[in-house]
Design a protein with these regions (language model features):
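Short, solvent-exposed positions on alpha-helices
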Residues: 23-26, 44
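PIN-domain endoribonuclease scaffold, especially VapC-family toxins
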Residues: 5, 26-30
Length: 91
């Protein structure tokens, strides 16, 4: 299983989400466990200029942006937001 690294921007979002919507945070945790246990699954890459990042839809309206480092066996979570806003994110 790969290790998990959550960037400060995503951590701030998850802390706020734990107070407002803990059910959705549980769904995110379950998806992250799935990603960490099966990182060879073909998760979609984003388009340019974010082409090095992967994405996965959570629930129906939200997107999680992450990267998988196969050399160091680390999944890094960068951002999470509504699908209308998430693609405007600048790393």
């Amino acid at each position: 299983m790969y290790n998990l690294d959550i960037k400060p921007e995503a951590d701030k979002i998850f802390r706020r989400l734990s107070k407002k919507n803990p059910k959705q945070l549980g769904i995110i945790d379950k998806k992250l466990l799935d990603i960490r246990s099966n990182p060879s699954h073909e998760y979609k890459f984003l388009r340019s200029p974010l082409q090095t990042y992967n994405r996965v839809h959570i629930d129906t309206h939200f997107v999680l942006i992450f990267k998988i480092d196969h050399e160091n066996k680390v999944v890094t979570v960068y951002y999470y937001d509504h699908h209308d806003k998430v693609y405007d994110w600048k790393p």
